[in-house]
Amino acid sequence: DNTFATPALQRPLEHGADVVVHSATQYLGGHSDVVGGIVATSDEELAQRLRYLQNAVGAVPSPFDCYLVLRGLKTLDVRMERHSANAAVIAEALQAHPQVERVRYPGLESHPTHRVAARQMSGFGGMVSFECGGGEAAALEVVSHTELFTLAESLGAVESLIEHPGRMTHASAAGSPLEVPASLVRCSVGIEDAADLVADLTAALDRLP
């Protein structure tokens, strides 16, 4: 699944992957106005089987949805550069904040797989998550008091989003090995001014006791 990185930052087929999937709803479309998905392979035989299945089950997007994704692809490179640059600034700022216990961003040298990401990616993307030292209550307080970051699920669009995975996107994983920490906050960093985004998150964190 190359949704978070997109072909602009990482090309899994060049690293030996047989099949790569993308949610075109996210960065490829990039504007929160289309729903779609893409399956890519360099194996022609497999590609023919996929085309047959697509035709047989009717999983065909509308012409207008295709237009929206193609429009998004025209600006994909410049958007991903800005997403990555903004996310790097935000990750560094979060790492220095006393209310933040841990920051998860592959662009940070502290990330356990930073070396792998640096080797196979040309940028580190726009997804940043962090754990609040004050636990779930602190995380819920933060996501409820940002102004530029919109409290919403989804990701990968030009606007910045913030959410509490334990209560939102990953709620169904509660009680399973895939359960996320209750103190976790996830940010889909947009292309707004980085200083404004840092100030927004800092203000929300500074509210915490």
Model segments located where?
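Conserved PLP-enzyme active-site core in the AAT-like
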Residues: 1-99, 104
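A common structural junction motif
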Residues: 57-58, 146-154, 204-209
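Active-site beta-loop-alpha junctions enriched in small/polar residues
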Residues: 3-5, 9, 108, 133, ...
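PLP-dependent enzyme catalytic core of the Aspartate aminotransferase-like
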Residues: 79, 144, 160-209
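Residues that form or flank phosphate/diphosphate-binding pockets in enzymes
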Residues: 7, 137, 196
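Short, well-ordered beta-strand elements within core beta-sheets of diverse protein domains
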Residues: 69-78, 125-133, 185-190
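Structural motif
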Residues: 18-20, 25, 38, 67, ...
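Conserved small-domain helix->loop->beta segment predominantly found in fold-type I
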Residues: 88-147, 153, 170-179
